[in-house]
């Protein structure tokens, strides 16, 4: 089971969009996928058509109350795709976990109890480097970093790499940079091309070949509670995320 944390402490880089659409594209390619939403905004939850208001238990109950993960998993309307939803209650979890025993291991322990045979677990991390993200990185065996092709992108990445190295040293020696994904690209602008070049130079073969362009369809899909592959199957966004999913499978 490959456990991939989609992580960047910088907001607005296409993290949740990538979590939803990578998970849905892997499921479309007949892989059994569990999406775990660990962002208190719960946008990955609503993005796959789950009503946030109708949820009785969420990732909050798993991390704070140590509820069994199998009791929280929900089947989505999409074949091969299940979700552990998030809720606004998670916003207070950081404080509640501070004094908890083995606080960084809660997610890892929960995932080890999963009954289903998932091929992939995709974790949507919150846009911060707090305890929830640490839990995700401790549980994962790979990190996918979405990086927006804009001026400050590399600055944010160096901060994230710092955290990655700390987690690797103290909490999870098996953690690996699975890939860096260029998002919201616009090949018509110099800055987009320059940043893409810098990221590829720095991360070499860790940078995915696939890039995700800025498109209207991709930004519309979440408000309809659908992954792009359902909302606009023939759009560029759908094709790009499908290509990314194939690259992820190829990388093992």
Please report, for each region that a protein language model flagged, where it lies by residue.
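P-loop NTP-binding core
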Residues: 1-252
